[in-house]
Design a protein with these regions (language model features):
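Acidic-residue sensor for enzyme active/binding pockets
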Residues: 56, 95, 104, 154, ...
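Short, glycine-/Ser/Thr-/acidic-enriched flexible segments
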Residues: 72-77, 84-86, 101-104, 110-112, ...
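Active-site pocket scaffolds in enzymes
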Residues: 109, 114-181
Length: 181
């Protein structure tokens, strides 16, 4: 980005030095490590919960670059997230938290590919199985190990460009008084 967009970022008055310090590899910490960071910062956090915006800011401030949080408690992730074969209480999921308080920009993980396990998980989550027929049909006759992720484009653009609010990166943002363009 800096090779191709330095002028644009300077026009936006982005502090380029903060982006120049972003180097690979990104730190990888477990969910438990992240909870420990919160506790060390006197945050009253309920284990098994997802992180809020303030929590993500505290975690990211420890690193000043994107940080990968993995090995989440399984109950905090979606039914389709595969469990860790070494510890079934953990999900094979990951979130990438951007620095400077921009929050989670990527969420992903390995997907459950076993049809029977998926049916049980849907039931465990008290979800109506008929709503997931199409999803189950994709795995009914066999599947392969696979993963997926979601990237928050607007939040990523907000972080890279240094904008104050995510709505500045959305062409037609929804607000309390405007729900359509």
């Amino acid at each position: 980005c800096l090779e191709h967009c330095r002028n644009e970022l300077e026009t936006l008055e982005r502090d380029i030095k903060k982006l120049e310090n972003i180097t690979l590899p990104f730190p990888r910490i477990t969910y438990d490590d992240a909870v420990e960071i919160l506790k060390n910062n006197n945050v009253d956090f309920e284990y098994g919960s997802d992180f809020g915006a303030t929590d993500e800011t505290i975690i990211s401030n420890q690193y000043q670059k994107p940080v990968m949080v993995h090995r989440w408690p399984a109950e905090s992730k979606a039914f389709y997230m595969k469990r860790d074969p070494k510890n079934s209480n953990l999900a094979l999921g990951v979130d990438m938290i951007a620095p400077e308080g921009y929050g989670e920009i990527v969420g992903g993980g390995q997907r459950e590919d076993d049809y029977k396990v998926l049916i049980n998980r849907i039931k465990e989550h008290n979800l109506p199985i008929e709503h997931f027929k199409w999803y189950l049909d994709l795995r009914k006759f066999g599947s392969v190990p696979h993963s997926g992720f979601g990237l928050g484009i607007e939040r990523t653009v907000a972080w890279i460009s240094g904008t104050k609010h995510i709505r500045e990166t959305i062409p037609y943002p929804r607000t309390m008084y405007r729900l359509e363009p």
